[in-house]
């Protein structure tokens, strides 16, 4: 590994650790020329997921877009940010295990809603109202009735 300080091509590994749930290897190195220490990260190069939108267009999967939608749905709700980040990570992992490359946007929305329903029902209804594009109160009430039936 080339030294980031002097550019020398040889370094020795002082320490190796697993990070990010085993998806990253962190190595502490020392340059054989200038003796300065630096850190490198080694991670799997994942194939990017492509989302097929309802209208047929394609766009790159963006976990920040999912998190943003969840944050709006969970506004003023007692849900920690790390819980939402964990939810997005779980959904992304499940998508990667079920799809090679192209994912229907419908599947992403359904996965998020199924998990959000178990975390916070108010946030779930907010998310569902946007995702399912409720156009009238009747459709909204149907969703609420479905939630109430699950509780009994």
Curated annotation (Swiss-Prot):
GO terms for molecular function: ATP binding; DNA binding; zinc ion binding. Its cofactor is Zn(2+). Residues 49-139 form the ATP-cone domain. The keyword Transcription applies. It holds the Pfam family Zn_ribbon_NrdR. Binds 1 zinc ion. Keywords: ATP-binding, DNA-binding, Metal-binding, Nucleotide-binding, Repressor, Transcription, Transcription regulation, Zinc, Zinc-finger. A zinc finger (unnamed) spans 3-34. One of its GO terms (biological process) is negative regulation of DNA-templated transcription. Belongs to the NrdR family. Negatively regulates transcription of bacterial ribonucleotide reductase nrd genes and operons by binding to NrdR-boxes. This is Transcriptional repressor NrdR. It comes from Heliobacterium modesticaldum (strain ATCC 51547 / Ice1). The lineage of its organism: Bacteria, Bacillati, Bacillota, Clostridia, Eubacteriales.
């Amino acid at each position: 590994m080339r030294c980031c300080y002097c550019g020398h091509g040889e370094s020795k590994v002082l320490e190796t650790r697993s990070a990010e749930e085993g998806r990253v290897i962190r190595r502490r190195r020392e340059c054989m020329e200038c003796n300065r220490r630096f850190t490198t990260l080694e991670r799997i190069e994942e194939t990017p997921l492509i989302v097929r939108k309802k209208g047929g267009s394609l766009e790159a999967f963006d976990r920040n877009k999912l998190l943003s939608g969840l944050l709006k749905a969970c506004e003023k709700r007692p849900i920690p940010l790390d819980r939402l980040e964990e939810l997005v990570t779980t959904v992304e992992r499940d998508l990667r295990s079920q799809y090679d490359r192209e994912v229907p946007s419908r599947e992403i929305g359904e996965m998020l809603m199924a998990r959000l329903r178990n975390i916070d029902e108010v946030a779930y209804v907010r998310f569902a109202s946007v995702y399912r594009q409720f156009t009238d109160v009747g459709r909204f009430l149907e969703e609420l009735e479905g939630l109430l039936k699950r509780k009994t």
